[in-house]
UniProtKB/Swiss-Prot annotation:
It is an enzyme of class 4 (lyase). Pfam families: SBP_bac_3, SLT. Residues 19-270 are annotated as: Non-LT domain. Its main location: membrane. InterPro entries: Lysozyme-like_dom_sf (IPR023346), MltF (IPR023703), Solute-binding_3/MltF_N (IPR001638), Transglycosylase_SLT_dom_1 (IPR008258). Its EC number is 4.2.2.n1. This is Membrane-bound lytic murein transglycosylase F.
Length: 483
């Protein structure tokens, strides 16, 4: 009997303890399980990100843009709610905000970190990236972290992941030291490397490629880590409607081509990097473009003036006296026939050339079938600007004959090189064309346009908010690393 009483007492105590322990967890689980409902009730999806040239930025027209913004906006539309963006300084700030329910999703080209598996949920991977050690071109290129000396200035942004990587290396290499600057973004540190203010930083490979388009002095020494999946982070929960909704959205985005279109918009141009070309171009942005900016703005019409400027650079490198062996002339490199059609008499007059080039490009846009999405018509028009309207229509026909969608720019552009292959052009109305050149032509213009946008964005940001000094940072040495 005594044993039974003891067992009952113990069982009762355990039951009370279990109730006491489980009840708050039930509240937490209930709260987490209702995270999706909370978003629906408030009518807003709150996404945390980082302001840079890939994830999120305000474009020259004052509109939000960036890969993570476009993807987040599409997901918010899928949920039937508004999107609220919270821009934070670094990944640690994002994870802290997510942990404290200040944001619903963290999205900033974040690499997969297994150690966060219990704290957060992972969304589907949509690309991959690695951590890279970056230095200034022209200086000695280190081959490994062991080649960094105590006098080298390695500065990183606030990142627990990077701190763990470097701390592990420091155990094998006691002389390794670095600074953590919580005031500067990853992009800002990359710019400081380019300007020679610091020796090295470590950055996400996606952000490195983007920064190189405006600061070609940025060079990659080596990858610190292997490539890892990039995905969104969500609040942790034993059951999550939000994660299920995101999975369904991402599956649909892959099937309908949304992911491919967003990646093409923000990634295709940064995949190409030619130091000499980009260096010459950024010099031209500084020294030559200001001479013609007013004219590009005056005659931009329905176009972004930066796109018109990019076309002119691709055509003539902003040389109003340019002449080719085939007879095209001027800053927009117009043929005599096009000049006559646009009713100008001096192709080497910059204003006449820019005006005619813009009007001709607008006319080409009007010739693109209305079945093509409005935002993609410009790429078809640029293809026609380069190789002729007939060949542009030919590549649409070819795409359809190969089972593709002629209204999908991604499918059409990959078929452009086929216009130079006899088995294909022999069956087309307008015959042979250097389609591979047209492909590169459009890619270059997109890259040049984005470089102008980001060059001015960085410049304006530095003017309005001068970079904090590198000395405003925490120095990590072997001694305080072990404390």
């Amino acid at each position: 009997m005594k044993g039974l009483v003891i067992r009952i007492s113990v069982a009762l105590a355990l039951l009370l303890w279990a109730v006491d322990m489980v009840f708050p967890w039930q509240q937490i689980i209930r709260s987490e399980a209702n995270h999706y409902e909370a978003i629906q009730e408030r009518g807003t999806l709150v996404v945390g990100t980082i302001n840079n040239s890939v994830s999120y930025f305000i474009d020259p027209n004052g509109n939000p843009a960036g890969l993570e913004y476009d993807l987040s906006k599409s997901f918010a539309d899928y949920l039937g709610v508004e999107l609220e963006i919270k821009s934070l300084d670094n990944s640690d700030a994002l994870f802290d905000a997510l942990q404290n329910n200040k944001i619903d999703i963290a999205a900033a080209n974040l690499l997969h970190q297994q150690r966060y598996q219990k704290q957060f949920q992972f969304g589907p991977a949509y690309t991959s990236a690695s951590w890279q050690l970056v230095y200034r071109k022209g200086k000695d290129k280190p081959r490994s972290l062991t080649q960094l000396s105590a006098k080298d200035k390695l500065v990183i942004t606030q990142s627990e992941e990077l701190l763990n990587i470097l701390s592990a290396q420091q155990k094998k290499q006691p002389t390794l030291s670095w600074q953590i600057n919580s005031l500067l973004s990853q992009e800002a540190l990359l710019l400081q490397v380019a300007e020679g203010k610091i020796d090295y930083t470590i950055a996400n490979s996606i952000d490195v490629s983007a920064a190189q388009q405006i600061k070609p002095e940025i060079a990659v020494a080596f990858d610190i880590t292997d490539e890892a999946d990039v995905h969104w982070y969500l609040p942790s929960s034993s059951y999550s409607e939000l994660q299920a909704a995101l999975l369904d959205f991402m599956n649909g985005a892959i099937e309908n081509g949304l992911i491919a279109r967003i990646e093409e918009k923000y990634f295709s141009h940064i995949a190409q990097f030619d130091y000499v070309d980009i260096k010459s171009y950024t010099n031209a942005i500084e020294k030559i473009l200001p001479k013609y900016t007013a004219l590009f703005k005056k005659y931009q019409g329905e176009l972004d003036w930066r796109l018109l400027a990019a076309v002119a650079y691709q055509e003539s490198h902003w040389n109003e006296d340019a002449t080719s062996p085939t007879g095209v002339r001027g800053i927009m490199m117009l043929t005599k026939a096009t000049a006559d059609r646009m009713k100008i008499n001096d192709r080497t007059d910059a204003e006449q050339s820019i005006k005619a080039g813009s009007e001709y490009l607008h006319w080409l846009i009007s010739q693109v079938p209305n079945s093509v999405p409005q935002e993609d018509k410009i790429w078809y028009a640029l293809t026609a600007y380069n190789m002729g309207l007939g060949h542009m229509l030919d590549v649409r026909r070819l795409t359809k004959s190969l089972g593709g969608d002629p209204d999908n720019w991604l499918e059409v552009k990959k078929n452009l090189p086929l216009l130079a292959e006899k088995q294909y052009y022999s069956k087309l109305k307008y015959g042979y064309a250097r389609g591979y050149e047209a492909f590169q032509y459009v890619e270059n213009i997109r890259r040049y346009m984005n470089s102008i946008i980001n060059y001015h964005r960085v410049r304006d940001d530095q003017i309005s908010r001068p970079l904090e000094k590198v000395t405003d940072s925490i120095m990590i040495t072997p001694q305080n690393s072990q404390d």
